[in-house]
Amino acid sequence: MSNAMTSKLERFIDQGVGRVPADIVLKGGCFFDLVTGELVQSDIAIGADRIVGTSGNYEGETEIDISGRIVVPGFIDTHLHIESSLVTPHEFDRCVLPYGVTTAICDPHEIANVLGAAGIEFFLESALETIMDIRVQLSSCVPATHLETSGADLPIESLLPYRHHPKVIGLAEFMNFPGVIHKDPICMAKLDAFQGGHIDGHAPLLSGNDLNGYLAAGIRTEHECTTASEALEKIRKGVHILVREGSVSKDLAALMPIITERLSPFLALCTDDRNPLDIAEQGHLDHMIRTAIASRVEPLAIYRAASISAARAFGLKDRGLVAPGWRADLVVLDSLENCRADMVFSAGRRVTDALFSSRRPVAPIGLDSVKARPVNAAHFGVPVAEGETPVIGVIPGKIITEHRRYRLPVRGNEAAVDLANDIIKVAVIERHGKNGNHANGFVQGFGLKKGAIASTVGHDSHNICVVGVSEDDMARAANRLSEIKGGFVVVEDGKVTGEIALPIAGLMSLEPYETVRDTLHQLRKAAFALGATLEEPFLQLAFLPLPVIPHLKISDRGMVDVDKFALIG
């Protein structure tokens, strides 16, 4: 051990014993003991980045009065894609840390699907600069499947150089569960390389012996549970369940029956995909905690899931409790029930605007990633099918879709939209400059009566996805995305009525999160003016091309029957 470390430890010991003042002391409040469930009236002494004393009286070089307030451990978001916040990691840090999220475990597979290893390096470089502790899971499935065209390919050889990076935890969500079960050689190589480390799961609706086989590969965490029964089967088989509540995937209500003190050691919280507008209006993990307690979940259960249980699930042994020797990631709350952060400490540093200003900026990348071919109305024709036509059925608040079938109206020799049944056109256009693929189909559930909306955010390969009533408007929206280098676009009667540019890989803005938030307000209004009924139409649109989530999706290669893991002929 170095002399510097010995000296540092000696100072921690002296501060804990009370021989010398702590760096910071929080006085007059209490803390929530997540071991016993007690509210403990106590000073909290901080030395550098760790807690050095509790359950006593301390003097500090800086003393902060928190009378009447409660201190809890910093919250840990155990699975998210920062790209879905539509801002850079630096702006995500500034946006979310004040809500008490002191650790975020991200999978940068959105940017990796567009830019490959360069996208992962951008996140790792950013994570070294943020105030929040951003940890990175290495994207396991780039591309997610062979049923779509992505911008990059990340074989195991591309991941191994990052395996021991200080910000890397392990292998990110293994979405290709059929590949695991059927022992696909590419999947096997990645799983083998990360045995003994953390491997994150992604196995919606998988059960029985197939689930056993999937877990036998060493997968330990999973965030795709949408029912309590699904979660219980996985918990019984040793899986740590990450309860999800994002901007589209809202599973908290369905999973509340399992959020109990008994099961809380095997639970954690995550957002997966959450945009700045929802964060500004509702919050982040604090929103999940408030919602759960309002629905009579025991505070001890949900606060454990938000911190200590989450830390243990991912091997972060230094955080998750308000106790001596633990990392000083702390949130000062008005009450456990309201869960409003009055003050946040990240590694012993009080979170302020000045602290964010001290970060080194990281240069943006991928500013010319949208290489789609121009389209016109004729590109969106769908030939009349014999019998019924497959239609993607959108379920509000879910990324799972239904495989529906309808006899559609005919216009000329083409199938047409059916507004009476809320069925409109959907198309995916390859935008990485590889093959110019273009696939068309139908979707039900957006509520559009006119116009079109389009996006370069299209999980997971992030091709252009557009839905609409008018083929002319669909073409205008798709072409406009190329002009602004990616983003979201709303078109009505040939005119762009709303847009946001996302030029970093076609996924993230160069603007501050406040600007993105305000622009999203206007964008939603433009979508609602077309008749959109979904609470989050753009993120819901972004999941239509995701062929690893049941049941019917669309990629640039065509309609995908996810249950059969095959294109529909």
Curated annotation (Swiss-Prot):
One GO MF annotation is:
adenine deaminase activity
Name the top EC class.
Answer: hydrolase
* InterPro entries assigned: Adenine_deam, Adenine_deam_C, Amidohydro-rel, Metal-dep_hydrolase_composite, Metal_Hydrolase
UniProt keywords (A-Z) are: Hydrolase, Manganese
Coiled-coil spans are none
Known cofactor(s): Mn(2+)
One GO term under biological process is: adenine catabolic process
Give the Enzyme Commission number: 3.5.4.2
Family classification: Belongs to the metallo-dependent hydrolases superfamily. Adenine deaminase family.
Instruction: Output the HAMAP family linked to this UniProt entry.
Output: Adenine_deamin
Q: What is this protein called?
A: Adenine deaminase 1
Q: Which organism is it from?
A: Rhizobium johnstonii (strain DSM 114642 / LMG 32736 / 3841) (Rhizobium leguminosarum bv. viciae)
